[in-house]
């Protein structure tokens, strides 16, 4: 049932805000980095026809090796020479968020724990509380918990799963979605 609810929110969303946390951070090995990029590449097919923005609390620039559009990514803790870390790109992100009110917004939080909760975790909770047309999917291997008031709304979902593994499963889900559209 949880998977069906999540698929419905994903399908119905007009806009998607994606937060990337420490579960999607490189450990310096090319094997892990390649796996993360490959997992992130599962997102674009699911985002077809939707406006999206990605905020990453990581500083490894892996998100830019993915097929996600760089203009719609901010990585505030990344290298200062990277434009995605600039104040201008942060302001682009804030303007994008301000345009989500009144729209069906899906907040997809992937692997965000408590390293920097002020960047993604807490703002995503607040946005979900304020925008009644929004829903939150929180995916984390050990910290997927939701505040009680959010969990009771029926618009927030806690998925206890490593975010890389969850993204890898999206390929199967995307195929199922395409088959439903073709039927």
Kindly label every feature range from the protein language model.
Residues 1-183:
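Conserved catalytic alpha/beta core of Sir2/sirtuin-type deacylases, generalized to analogous enzyme cores
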């Amino acid at each position: 049932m949880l998977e069906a609810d999540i698929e419905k929110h994903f399908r119905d969303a007009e806009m998607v805000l994606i937060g990337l946390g420490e579960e999607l951070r490189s450990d310096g090995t090319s094997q892990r980095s390649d796996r993360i990029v490959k997992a992130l590449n599962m997102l674009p097919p699911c985002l077809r026809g939707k406006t999206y923005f990605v905020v990453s609390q990581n500083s490894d620039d892996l998100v830019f090796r993915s097929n996600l559009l760089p203009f719609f990514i901010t990585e505030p803790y990344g290298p200062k020479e990277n434009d995605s870390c600039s104040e201008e790109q942060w302001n682009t992100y804030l303007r994008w968020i301000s345009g989500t009110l009144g729209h069906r917004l899906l907040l997809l939080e992937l692997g965000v724990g408590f390293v920097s909760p002020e960047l993604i975790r807490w703002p995503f909770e607040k946005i979900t509380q304020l925008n009644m047309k929004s829903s939150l999917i929180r995916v984390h291997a050990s910290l997927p918990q939701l505040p009680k008031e959010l969990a009771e709304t029926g618009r927030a979902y806690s998925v206890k799963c490593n975010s890389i593994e969850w993204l890898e499963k999206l390929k199967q889900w995307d195929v199922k979605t395409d088959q439903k559209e073709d039927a």
